[in-house]
Amino acid sequence: MCIRDSPWVEDASNEYIKRFGIDYALVLKMIKPAKRKEGRKIASLLIEEEQKIKAALPHRTRLVVMDETGRAMNSMAFAKLLQYWGQQSLDPCFIIGSADGVSENLKKQSTLLQLSEFSLPHGLAKVILIEQLYRAVSIIKGLPYHRS
């Protein structure tokens, strides 16, 4: 089974990724979700997905789960948070969970941030997150992209 984004998600994501330039590296990894089979409990699926996520993580990572219960913040606050993590030499790893979210254990080990109070399809959540990362970088670098 191949996991691919819709063409519009790839196009929009790539548009923002190319704007980052050489100062910031953005690495995207898509983890194949656990197979949803009749009789499997969601908790066991989420634990399997947690193991796959952790296996794909680099060292010295700050886990950030995008979650509906996470802290809401504006773009300026998000930029300050990214800047702080950079000063601490922590590479943030942003996680958008499967359709069932992420395991409670992974949530406990992570900073929880909210993209929106709306439920979003994964592709749109990905594009919004990448755009907000670019916006935060432009704020940090003093570029004119963000207007308060």
Please identify what each model-predicted range represents:
Residues 1-5:
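Conserved small/polar residues in nucleotide/adenosyl-binding loops
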Residues 25-26, 32-93:
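S-adenosyl-L-methionine/SAH cofactor-binding core of RNA-modifying enzymes
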Residues 97:
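Rossmann-fold NAD(P)-binding glycine/threonine-rich loop
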Residues 12-23:
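A short, Lys/Arg-enriched amphipathic alpha-helix followed by its capping loop at the start of a domain
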